[in-house]
Structures are given as C-alpha cells and as structure tokens.
UniProtKB/Swiss-Prot annotation:
Keyword annotations from UniProtKB, A to Z: Glycosidase, Hydrolase
Keyword Hydrolase assigned: yes
Molecular function in Gene Ontology: purine nucleosidase activity
GO cellular component: cytosol
Example GO BP: purine nucleoside catabolic process
Enzyme class: hydrolase
Disulfide partners: none
Name this polypeptide is given: Non-specific ribonucleoside hydrolase RihC
Function of the protein: Hydrolyzes both purine and pyrimidine ribonucleosides with a broad-substrate specificity.
UniProt KW Disulfide bond keyword: no
CDD domains with a match to the protein in the record: nuc_hydro_IU_UC_XIUA
C-alpha cells in the first residue's frame, strides 16, 4: 500500500507517545516527514532524548526538531508521576550520537509546510505550545495545514484537574490560540481516549510480536495510566488511529473554547455540544470509540513494526 497522508507529529514522549510514534512510523497509510518535541510529560530535553532514542531503536532517519521548553506564559507542570522521571521508564535503549536539527520546532514545521507540494496534516499529541508559536510567528502557514488532529481536551471531566485534560491544562493560552485560529481541527479528547484501553490479554501478547512489542511491553509495565492487570489507556494513539481509521470514531461539530482565567477551571475545554453559546463550530470533537475495532487496528499496526 502506498502511503497517501503526509504528516508532521508534535509529541512529548511519554510512554503512550512511544506507541503513537510507532504507529505513525509504521502504519502503511502514513508518511511521517517530521517529528517535533515539546515540554509536557517531562522536560523538552527529556522528550527530545526519548524521541531520538526511539528513532535510533527503529533505525529511522526521520528528522527531529526540539521545541518549546516552557508553556507560553506559565511554568511547566509535567506528568513524570505517570511516565517516570525520564519519561520512558522501563527499557534500556542503546546509546547513540544522533542530534536534533539545528533549528527550533516551529521553524522546522514551517520549513516542511512551505516546501510541501500540498497542504499537510499536523498531529499534536502533547501541549500545543509549538503549534501556537508557529501560528504566532508565521500565520501564513495556516494555508499549508490541511488539518490539525490533536489529542487533548475533554467534553466532561479532566485527568489533570477536575475539569481539565493534561495537554490543554499545561499550556491553556497556546490551546486557546489554536482553537481560535480557524484551522480545521479534530479533537480526540478524554471522551474517547479513556475508552482506548489495551487489555491485559493484548498486552501479554506483545513480547512475542516483534522487538517493538517487547520494547512497548517493557514501557507499559511502568506506565501509570492503568496497569498491566487492568489494561492501559492509549491516549495519544487515538490521534493516529483517527488518521487511518476515522470510521472507528463518532465525531460532532462543536464550538470549543479554552478557559485561561479560572482559578479552578484554567485549561478546561468548554465543548458546546448542544450549541447553547450560539457560536459557529470550530472543531470536530470525538465523543465515542469502537473499542474492539481500535484494538484490532493497534494489533495490525504494531505487527507492521520490526
């Protein structure tokens, strides 16, 4: 099968990011042209190191650019309590000498977009700082973005504060800018990602699959979004799944605003499902997931990896 969808992946690895990067690399329908890193699950130095380790593990020459070290206006609050201090605890990667590109992520994204023969899809599975910087410095690039598919937000409860999902809550000002940008946005939030569980039976079969399965199994043993006994949530993998298997998701056009001021609600995505605010829709929001179909696709794409 010829890859037909050219993508740029912005990420903050992160254990579930590792699974998403594997899918982005090895799903035959996708052509991954650039990876950029951002501070989120851990510091940007660590997310960059982790992404480079993964690319070395897979012997991939995909270019990688390091991005923002802090949110636009706030100090970084990370998720090392979920992913471990390194961000990818549980597997001993081989040392390598590879370095990121000598330019920041938002400039690397601009360069790829402006040199592409047609608009490209951005996939953001961390805080939206790099995407906001791109739009702030190079607003003309919006015409070269086919759509933005993101893992973030929630139409209901949060996983970082009572109402806010982690990726949005880390940099709500960046997220607010992105949702106001006019980009075509597909939002895969907690409403679907909390359903995206890999079962214990599925997890136990990973080591026999291939060396990627062995590596991911080792990482999942240290992942604190679920457990090997009850299943683990593949939040970031949902964004990649939508690219390849959109029929697995139920989407609704909604107006989405990001709260930036509330003492208790900063980072909340206000998803106007019933249209009460009278604002035009600015996102396609995923609200339900075919879990069995998702698991089948994950098994298929992991089997494509070495």
């Amino acid at each position: 099968m010829t890859a037909s969808l050219h993508i740029i992946l912005d990420t903050d690895p992160g254990i579930d990011d590792a699974a998403a990067i594997a899918a982005a690399l090895f799903a035959p329908q996708l052509d991954l042209q650039l990876i950029t890193t951002v501070a989120g699950n851990v510091s940007v130095e660590k997310t960059t190191r982790n992404a480079l380790q993964l690319l070395h593990f897979w012997n991939s020459d995909i270019p990688l650019a390091q991005g923002a070290a802090t949110p636009l206006l706030r100090p970084l609050r990370d998720a090392a309590y979920v992913h471990g201090e390194s961000g990818m605890e549980g597997y001993d990667f081989v040392d390598h000498q590879r370095q990121p590109l000598a330019k920041p992520a938002f400039i690397a994204i601009r360069d790829v977009l402006m040199n592409a023969p047609e608009p490209m899809t951005l996939v953001a599975i961390g805080p939206l700082t790099n995407i906001a910087l791109l739009l702030m410095h190079y607003p003309e690039c919006a015409c070269n973005i086919r759509r933005l598919v993101l893992m973030g937000g929630s139409a209901g409860r949060g996983n970082f504060t009572p109402n806010a999902e982690f990726n949005i809550a880390v940099d709500p000002e960046a997220a607010a800018l992105v949702f106001r940008s006019g980009l075509e946005i597909v939002m895969c939030g907690l409403d679907v990602t909390n359903q995206a569980m890999l079962s214990p039976d599925f997890l136990n079969k990973l080591p026999a699959l291939n060396r990627t399965g062995k590596m991911l199994h080792s990482l999942f043993n240290h992942y604190r979004s679920g457990s090997m006994r009850t299943g683990v949530r593949m939040h970031d993998l949902c964004a990649i799944a939508w690219l390849v298997r959109p029929e697995l998701f139920t989407l609704q056009s909604c107006f989405v605003a990001v709260e930036t001021q509330g003492q208790y609600t900063a980072g909340t995505t206000v998803v106007d499902i019933e249209g009460r605010l009278g604002q035009p829709a600015n996102a396609q929001v995923a609200l339900a997931l075919d879990v069995d179909g998702f698991r089948q696709w994950v098994a298929e794409v992991f089997a494509c990896a070495p």
